[in-house]
Amino acid sequence: MRKRKVAIIGSGNIGTDLMIKILRHGQHLEMAVMVGIDPQSDGLARARRLGVATTHEGVGGLMQMAEFADIDFVFDATSAGAHIKNDAALREAKPGIRVIDLTPAAIGPYCVPVVNLADNLHQGNVNMVTCGGQATIPMVAAVSRVAKVHYAEIVASIASQSAGPGTRANIDEFTETTSQAIEKVGGAGKGKAIIVLNPAEPPLMMRDTVYILSELASQEAIAASIAEMAAAVQAYVPGYRLKQQVQFEVIPEDRPVNLPGVGCFSGLKTAVYLEVEGAAHYLPAYAGNLDIMTSAALATAEQMAGAMHSAAGATA
């Protein structure tokens, strides 16, 4: 079976970790080119040491390379603004190319593998939301498939050391993109996202808190749905886990809570507490926020490539 060749744009933390994952674990994918803009970057130097072709001239440099003719997938780990330009350039040069967007740009549909990848296998561009979205949206969706979710709020706490310049430059986009995806993918009527950069030393692992307000439903059914969804995420992010038991609170009709922008609410409040430990392929174990993004992106592209192979076999 022919592996699909891959280029990664962005030689920072996320791009480098993703490269190492593909080199070690790629089933349908083969690492071909690492693209950066800083000739002195550690990511480009590491790629060269690992035998991967590189360019420090951005997406323009990639398109000038002989290897570009064989590239089927491009992962973009730059920034929201850069991705818009990168996608346009790639699409003009190669209309059928598959682009996996790890920025908050969201040109294509939001993709959270365990929730909606099957609906997006044939998209030309998919957006991996954010680290907080990849960790928490599965929990919102787990409740949503049992009961109607009116409101979901997530708080993602990540180690300050794991937040590179791209993450820091995209804080506003993080909250906006995650909030929208909580609604569109998670199924919540209204979503809200908060990110906290924790400066603690030694750095703490990624922690996520998810508050979900839904119609009254069986607490046992919701807890079972959450456990099942957590196991599905663990299939591609082994360090993903429930930190403690799911907590429930019934909010009675005669004592509703008032949510600004949503209104008065009564029903069931579900609280989910998560921890994400990184696989430490390139990044430290505390950087679970970056690991879950690269793991989700790899799982998405692998399944897309597998579907392409199956389709090619069916028409052969």
Curated annotation (Swiss-Prot):
InterPro entries: Acetaldehyde_dehydrogenase, Acetylaldehyde_DH_C, NAD(P)-bd_dom_sf, Semialdehyde_DH_NAD-bd. It comes from the Bacteria. NAD(+) binds at residues 11-14, 162-170, 289. Its EC number is 1.2.1.10. The keyword NAD applies. It is an enzyme of class 1 (oxidoreductase). Interacts with MhpE. This is Acetaldehyde dehydrogenase. It comes from Klebsiella pneumoniae subsp. pneumoniae (strain ATCC 700721 / MGH 78578).
